[in-house]
């Protein structure tokens, strides 16, 4: 049974604050193990990768090879069911089109003083995409991570994916082909992150690593950050649904369970202004759980971290939503557009009863790599801007230097940086005391 909170209860603020700080992940202290793996890969390169892959994934690179061949990708595409391949193509087309609208433009201009200023955008040289294996091997995530990089103009996109026994989900390889990724290695874990960051005899290093993974992958990303950039450290998935009584309870229950089935640590929250509707949704959740293939996972998520929050009116719902800062926010009310301007903290907003969050997971076009664990308060979902860099541009002529130089000299000397001051003064023939 999910937790039940009522805005009008005297204990609500205390209970809600406690709810916000509920820990949904079991912390594993894997830093020492990960550091040893990273150091080993840096020291032994391919040999270390071969050893770890044999130990953890049962792979013999002398048989399978480390790199996935183009022929293997071709075969994978033929192995994917036609309806799945068609759906991946629909998703890829929409994701690429939407992300093209995110491309920033250079802005070079001259101000009233005649000083040239501006910003220039360039793609990152090389990006590494980590794709989880096993039950978390999602081809849709390949598209979501790789296509924005392709749109940004990243010239080299590398994919690593753990391959138990050497095999990789064919749909994952098909998605890679659709996204233009051809450099793929069957490695995973902290060792794959280390290889991407520092390089080996076979794998050239990249400049940034993106993609989710387990505790070892997350720890490795943290440890290599600074040598390379990273996207984010993703936590369990979450959804907040704000819904009125005019919704079908089964629809809302299905949306809640769509998140709950991801992980026992996932979180699904309903905010409603109608207690009877909240009851109906809870009953619908219990009913639908009986037929879900991943019922055990979804039930644990709903039991341990789910919530139904009753508010007297939806004016109270929006401030609560901003405090929760959910990864996904569904607005299933009579006038959802009226709420949108007041929503400040959400990874993605899904507007109206006919916009289930799942459409955003796959074929909507927006990205499903979003900030979790309340990090939407200060960060954004993955997009083209994650794969480009902004360089500032500045140009002065002699006239502009004469105008601005004295102020620069004064500020430099006020900070005790005489060499800074002289760098300008020498151009103005002011001497050391100028």
UniProtKB/Swiss-Prot annotation:
GO CC aspect terms: cytosol
Binding site for NAD(+): 130, 191, 214
Designated name of the protein: Histidinol dehydrogenase
EC number assigned by the record: 1.1.1.23
Co-factor: note: Binds 1 zinc ion per subunit.
GO biological process, one term: L-histidine biosynthetic process
Pathway in which this enzyme or protein is active: Amino-acid biosynthesis; L-histidine biosynthesis; L-histidine from 5-phospho-alpha-D-ribose 1-diphosphate: step 9/9
Class of enzymatic activity (EC top level): oxidoreductase
Organism: Rhizobium meliloti (strain 1021) (Ensifer meliloti)
Task performed by this protein: Catalyzes the sequential NAD-dependent oxidations of L-histidinol to L-histidinaldehyde and then to L-histidine.
Alphabetical list of InterPro entries matching this protein: Ald_DH/histidinol_DH (IPR016161), Histidinol_DH_CS (IPR001692), Histidinol_DH_monofunct (IPR022695), Hstdl_DH (IPR012131)
Keyword presence, Phosphoprotein: no
